[in-house]
Each structure stands twice: as C-alpha cells, then as structure tokens.
C-alpha cells in the first residue's frame, strides 16, 4: 500500500482518508501533495522534458514557455464519452448521456483498479474563483498526469493557500483523473500516455468527478468544464445562481460610464477575441477590459442586480487564427510562461499555427512531431495555449473582486451563415431566454464530430449543463422573475438580453461583417440601449438598429452591406422557428410552457416579415 504521508499543511481528516481510499484503488507508486510553488512547477516541467512529454521553446522568444504534443487520438473534448450520472435518468435529461450511478460506479471501480500503477499520484488542491470568495468553490484533483498538475496551476488558484481556506472540515469537490496507462515494472513510458477507452463522469448529487483515459484539457483539467460548468450548474440550480459558458468584459465610454457584459458563444465563435477586444479607429477614449473569456458564475445581489465572477485563473484558448491583428491583447498575454499544446514549432524553437502569419515558416515541425507537409495542417485546429489571466494587458482591475462585477447585459450568439441578423434585442426576459434556448451554431473543431452542420446549442451550454436542459431553461425563467422583483424594489433593472451573429455570409460565401474590433460598434449600441438613449426598430424577432443607429466613424462599411446582414427572410425565419420544435420535443414534458407559448407567438409574428 502506497504511503499517503500528508504534509502538515493538510489538516482535513476526511480529505486525507479519501486520498488513502483512492490510492488503495488506483495503486500509484507514490503520492505527491502539490503546494503550487515555483520550484514544484519547474521540477514537474523538467520531469516532462526528460520524459519527452514537453519540449522547451526558444527561451529568448518564449521565456518560460513549453510545448506538449498530445497523442493524435486525444485532442478534444469527448462529448459522447461524457456522462451525467444523476440518481434519476430524467434529471440528466435528453441532451446528456446518462448511466445509473451504481452501474457506472461498478464499471469505473473495475477500470480504476490499479490504473496508476508505476506512476505518481499528484494531489492538486484548487479554488475556482478568488480564494475565500463567497462565490468560489474548492476542488481537489487526484491525477497521475504532471501535465494536469502544471496546467491547473495556471487555470485555477492552485496550492497551499487552498488548504488554509479548507481548514479541517471545509467542503470540496472530489475529482479523480487518470490517463489510464499503468506501467509495469521496468516498462518504458510513452510521451503522451492515454487510453482509447475514455469516460468523463459526473455525479451531481454527490458532487464527484471521475475522468478516465484522456490527458487533454477539457477532459483532464477537472476544474474547468467538469466542475465550473457541469457540477456548478447543478449546484447553482439548487442554490439560486448560474454557472454559465460566458465571457465577461467591462466597457468604459469616454464619459467614464462603465458596464459589464456577459456573453455566451459556443466554442470557436470568438469568445476570447471578444473578451479582449481593442476598440477600432473612431473609438478613442473607449476602453474594453477583460474579466474572463470562458466561464462566468453569476449570483443575485441584495440590490437585485446579478454579480459575476470568472472562476478561472487562466486562459485555455484556441491558438489557430490568433494573431496580432485578430487579438493583439491575447498575443501580448502570450509573451512568457505559456504551456502550448499541439501547435507547430519552427526550427529555431518558436511556436507557429495557421493564421499566425501569412507565410508558413520553412522546416516546420508539425503538431505530431513530424516534418510539416505543405497542404496539411501544421497545428491541430484545436491546438491550445494555457496562460495565467493576470498576464493579459486588458485584464480588468476587478477581475478578482470576490464580490463579482454587476452585469448590465447578456449577449448570446452563434455561427450562422444566414437567417439571424447582426444584432437584435429581446423584447423581455422570457423572449431573451427563448432566443438563448434555441441558439444554433455551425459545428466546429473544439468537439469531436462533423463540421459545418447547424446544431442547437442552448445558451452555448449543450455539452456543459449538469442537469436536465428543460429544468435549466426553467431555472433561468424563475431566476429572472425573482431577481426582477428584487431589482424593481431597489430601483434597478434586469440585464437586457441581446442576440448577435458576426458570421452572416454573402451569395459568394464570404463573411460580410469584419468582426473583431469592429464588434465595438454593436457593443456601443447595446450600452446605449441599456442607458435608454439609443433608437431601435421593433421587428417580429426583436428590436434592431437601423444603419443610422450605429456609429460608423473610422470605417466605410456601407448601408448595403449592413442591410445584407440585418435582413430578415420570412421563409428562413419560419423554417428556423419550426426547427426549434425538434429540440422542444426532445426535452418533452418538462419544457417550460412559457417557451412553447413564445414559439407560437413568434411563428405568428414572422408571417408579417
């Protein structure tokens, strides 16, 4: 039996007993209690360089930065192997994979038996959210992957201080992770151990996470999607708050008025770019600051406003397409201390990916560690960077405020070639929830599967809601009602809800809207709507701006182009709204009646387009 040897700074008997129990099951060669120190980080990096898991990059150009190349079979989240094992199947709902908890436990007990043989088990303590915040949650991840241990140090508040908050009897979310590649004595390890069989399992009632077979980010960094969205959304439903797949940004106008906006886009629809937006020419005196680029935890305040924190401490961003033109703030964030995964590397040890520069450098080594072949992808489409959020030049002064920041508006948007206009404002909270619930987006490389097919991705939470999606819609409706009453009493208002689509195409298939920094023009109109000073036209699908309602200083974007991306087609909208029935039927009896009623009203309204 492996010695647990808990250090003095761990004073939590229940935690120590749990580590003992998991060690008994997984049988690691040794146990290491992570303290989050610089020394520990460097030691684990050096260990991975020696093992061939990582390589040091050019330290002049990329100080403190390293590259890991994963196994080609382990490159993205595996939605078909992700389970919500609630006690009752109907509590997981039709959009989640479900297995009876006792069946799954029996299966996992068999798989985890001896799964860490020959490896070190790392005990990784982490806080999602600022340490000690009333919105934060503590997790402990037991993993046999040093890649996970070093990545968690960037993505969460990881280290000794977590145990001070935890004390002797604090609550924590238990997370168990294995790459599922036990080593027999004397057996040589591979650079990226993983297993063709994969399970990412959540038990919402007992707040446990078990992950088997994958070393990749979203499947292995269990504080991220697993805790911060799937488990946290189930907690939020019980406790009256929201865990959302949203960026949070602050907008300050030249008058000094500041608003915080939370926005939900599916993966690879530009969340990180939008969160770090740089205002374009014509917007001197405006400022955009970043609170978070991926996840928001939102709790109602006593004043009836909704307050959000970014539970993460780092960015785990998609590298391809990122460059000094599309996201200068992000590129500046990557100036040092980055862990890259599945990008290409130049012969002098610099990183490269599609979209970083027009010219492909000569003698590239691709993400599989082989010489790059022209016409093939040098970096994997889902290649990532992992970096501390504090390095971002646009980071908001309040990004770690334990009380959170007050949200003025929610934005929902997907990747649609037609139908959905550039921007529209919902008529009211119920209408906004309907629009978010029926969001559609063309599929991308961030999930394994087909590309270019429109799938419904409610609230951009389809892969991340930890309970029945119909109950999730109901939770949004109920929360709106409760918070709305509180807000009214305090003289405040519920956040406005907007829909955007940066991705409309013309007849030749080209994007019409320039996007990136130009999205500031849409953001300004939204802020002015919140402040009650911008015009809008009422249409069957919401309030929309005219060409004259937007600020075009510094650009020659024409009225014809604007009309092209804001036009509403009666036939397209009838097809669109009728297609929502498929999702609603899938959700069955638990679907809130208010949404079905809203669908009927919309169907009648769009006949008038």
Swiss-Prot record:
The keyword Cytoplasm applies. Its main location: cytoplasm. Binds 1 Mn(2+) ion per subunit. Keywords: Cytoplasm, Decarboxylase, Gluconeogenesis, GTP-binding, Lyase, Manganese, Metal-binding, Nucleotide-binding. InterPro entries: PEP_carboxykin_GTP_CS, PEP_carboxykinase_C, PEP_carboxykinase_GTP, PEP_carboxykinase_GTP_C, PEP_carboxykinase_GTP_N, PEP_carboxykinase_N. It holds the Pfam family PEPCK_N. The keyword Cell division does not apply. This is Phosphoenolpyruvate carboxykinase [GTP].
